[in-house]
Amino acid sequence: MAASTAAPCYDAPEGVDVRGRYDREFAGILTRDALDFVAGLQREFRGAVRYAMEQRREAQRRYDAGELPRFDPATTLVREGDWTCASVPPAVADRTVEITGPAEPRKMVINALNSGAKVFMADFEDAMSPTWENLMHGQVNLRDAVAGTISFRDAPRGRTYELNDRTAKLFVRPRGWHLPEAHILIDGEPAIGCLVDFGLYFFHNHAAFGAGQGAGFGPLCDLPKMEHSREARIWNGVFQRAEKAAGIEPGSIRATVLVETLPAVFQMNEILHELREHSAGLNCGRWDYIFSYVKTFRAHPDRLLPDRALVGMAQHFMRSYSHLLIHTCHRRGVHAMGGMAAQIPIKDDAAANEAALELVRKDKLREVRAGHDGTWAAHPGLIPAIREVFEGHLGGRPNQIGDAAGHEGASVKEEDLIQPPRGARTVDGLRLNVRVGVQYLAAWLAGSGSVPLYNLMEDAATAEISRVQNWQWLRHGAALDAGGVEVRATPELLARVVEEEMARVEAEVGPDRFRKGRYAEAGRIFSRQCTAPELDDFLTLDAYNLIVAHHPGASPCKL
């Protein structure tokens, strides 16, 4: 009898179809029981997720019709009530500096855990291109990191990377509610990406969390892109189901919510209230927040942003957002985390490198003086400077939760949070948006979601800001300064700018890399997005189908 030549496949439960490439290492993550756990989460919560996504669309329709975001009168009692969240886990009381980066590649995970930061936020979201290989390798990496066994052999350099005796505490950021996982079908539908990310990570690691995170705590998460407290309520339900299934103490799972959408800034108390048993505070996701400001006000010609380089924390609406977040978190007894420092070391120019570090120091001094308890960094080289600023101000305290810091937020009003930003709009700004947006998207399509560009570590938020700003300027025919001459933003101007900037990118990266990369494809997608009649919600959602690779041989075995 001839030996079977059937391709190996994943052992999936009824109703689950794995379409991603089969790999024996991945099969250790995609076990039957793990997939059954993820499927159970999806089946229980998919109706609530669909409703929440429809409510997002309905809210946007109201904003497009002229309504402005505001505090919800129906939840006044929550905002004014005297309540606090569960006490801070002792193991993560000190979060003065957190380093962020994708969960894959493996060497980057090890370096981040060894970086000297208090926390490493391993990302399945904006800093990762969600290819099948990245997602599955990321789960393998985090399983090994939690176990303390992760290592990497760099054969060409003859170097082995391993964990130090003391490492950063591990947080994990799953994708947002809106993103699917098309390589896994549940009852014929794409899986909800964040439930795959969280579900697989939790299932394989919950028994080991206590050793690394502190007894009775874990996992620790960051939750992105929420717009309303109903979305936090779903996460709370997911956490409760997971804790019950694992037989661990309620409240073991803790999550920091990134306030990175304009609607969410009006829902911060409500979000914390929904997650009060599981909350680890809020974070100023400032780059995506700018993106969301444009998207929310896409139909409002009186709210055009200036060049994105001018939209910093000195703008009134950004400063108000930061102050209100700090006040809200400290009132509820949780961490108020600051925003990302995206600078990366400039190795060949000491003066430029010191100037960049000085910008980081000033930004972080502003944050800690305002009352933030910690902040984010994109590169290990920033950590010593940031720690010096925060630790020098805190004077040995792990955080400012019990202090009066952040009282400025008590007086923030609705109009403060939506005040139009000031500054010039220029053709140079349009050019930079094209140049950075196209290069980021090309890297994302090629499998990299954390991309060094012009001495900054960029993630998807940069491409999103660049895209929606160009779209907004074109949609409303914004007047742009072209070296002292006023020109109107038009599709014809954008086409010329794209052609010229693509040539510049080719000159910068070299013809061979340009030809082999996905730059031309990225240029077409970016141009189409900027000139579309209707603004797409997310660039990464539109481009996702271009990185999905179904392998029929990987489908579950049929006996």
Curated annotation (Swiss-Prot):
Its main location: other. Coiled coil: none annotated. It is an enzyme of class 2 (transferase). The active site is at R173, D459. One of its GO terms (cellular component) is cytoplasm. It catalyses: glyoxylate + acetyl-CoA + H2O = (S)-malate + CoA + H(+). Keywords: Glyoxylate bypass, Glyoxysome, Peroxisome, Transferase, Tricarboxylic acid cycle. One of its GO terms (biological process) is glyoxylate cycle. It comes from the Eukaryota. GO terms for molecular function: malate synthase activity. It is found in: Glyoxysome. A motif (Microbody targeting signal) lies at residues 557-559. The keyword Transferase applies. Its EC number is 2.3.3.9. Pathway: Carbohydrate metabolism; glyoxylate cycle; (S)-malate from isocitrate: step 2/2. Belongs to the malate synthase family. PANTHER family: MALATE SYNTHASE, MALATE SYNTHASE 1-RELATED. NCBIfam families: malate_syn_A. This is Malate synthase, glyoxysomal. The lineage of its organism: Eukaryota, Viridiplantae, Streptophyta, Embryophyta, Tracheophyta.
